Amino acid sequence: MHSALTDRQRQDAYQRMQNGTAKIAIGTRSAVFAPVQNLGILIVDEEGERTYKSENAPRYHAVAVARKRCQTHHCPLLLASATPSIESYYYAKKGVYTLLELKKRYRNMPLPEVTVVDMNRERQLGNGTPFSNALIDAMQETLSHGKQVLLLLNRRGYHTMISCCSCNEPVYCPNCSVPMTYHKVSDQLMCHYCGHMQPMPETCPHCGGKQFRRMGFGTQQMEEQLQLLFPKARVLRMDADTTGSRYAYEESLQHSAQEYELWLYADDWKGLDFPDVTLVGVLSLDQALFAGDFRSYERTFSLITQVVGRSGRGDTAGRAILQTFLPNHYVLQLAAQQNYPVFYEQEYAIRKTMLFPPFCDLCILGFVGEKEEIVAAAAAEAVRQIQVYVKEQAFSYPLWVLGAVPCHYERLKGKYRYRVILKCKNTSPYRTLIRAVLEAVTAQKAFAKLYLYADMNGDIGV
């Protein structure tokens, strides 16, 4: 079950589950609602994956829904991951969950050897390309032995940003407060948030300058450079630009195991299993460490660990090369060592000190509208209403209020976005407060046209 099913296919799948013809249901996030009648076990694979959280209404987390379903059906819930979420591992350590550990890798193969390459040193040696000398040599050796290479670069496009040479301002999307990305195939700038496309401007919209610098590198440029470095190797680029059609992703995977030697990915690698891949290269993940969310370290550690694990899954031992300008950062070092227990202890200490989940819940009160001054006023009014409620209702539970402030991306798809973040608990008294505050704000005529929402433990880095 997945979003690509037609209405007819989805109806057929639901009927097969309801009448018991289908004994096993497999699917993406929404499959947690599958109408299985006699539920015996519910398995959430890669339970720490961020896509299990719906950021649009209805806002829910598939793991929370799975937990409730298993309580209702009196059956076990299995949360599986090589890199569990900090919250899940915390509950396992406390004994709320039962912790089951796999001590050996599949087929008893050794973990890949990971080399961390300091890209600052590469620049000092005059190497201005995105590929370190160590990675180029390793790719050449791997290809010469008839094996395959996987490369990760989580940035689409050709150049990641275009800026003016006179004022240094980027070219922003007219609908979003986000710099646009240059795509060479279409020779256009594209916003990866709203999809807006436009040609390169002749003059800077900020100062009128006529010269621009093209900065950063994306998967399109990497594909081009790989073809120059290894002209005999067949390169497969997989990102949202090449796998946008309904079956393109599956078709690419079906052919890639036999037809390509170099694979370039821009997306998540979890679950991929290709026995001839003996080298994995992470081109750049430094920016992911500073994504504006308290989960940034966790997600970076998880992605690197999962990527490294794609190497050496066959009969030949694998290796991985991690390129970074932050070679001494503890997250990158522990990810290279694949040392989750030590990483957990580090993250545990930070979250306990800063009071982040699992030591509290975060409720994001969101305010969205076309006029910034009205959106900002609504967010400020929500803070005032919280203060009124706490005083009038003698609210004695611990509560921390952060904001009102603009969201990480203040404007998306033509709408301004502000938020108030509450550090609280997802319990009835807090939910009553949140409901009362939102109702008090929406009751005011000035804010009637705004979109307001409450999102428990959502992504604050957007």
Give residue ranges: language-model regions.
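Short amphipathic alpha-helices in soluble, non-transmembrane regions
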Residues: 378-385, 431-440
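Short beta-strand elements
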Residues: 389-407, 448-456
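Short helix-loop-beta junction
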Residues: 227-233, 384-392
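Generic C-terminus detector
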Residues: 435-462
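Conserved beta/loop motifs at nucleotide-recognition and modification sites
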Residues: 151, 384, 391, 445, ...
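Generic hydrophobic alpha-helical scaffold/packing signal
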Residues: 305-308, 383, 387, 421, ...
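Inter-lobe coupling/hinge segments of SF2-like helicase ATPases
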Residues: 1-376, 410, 420, 428
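Short, low-order "capping/linker" segments at domain edges
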Residues: 410-423, 456-462
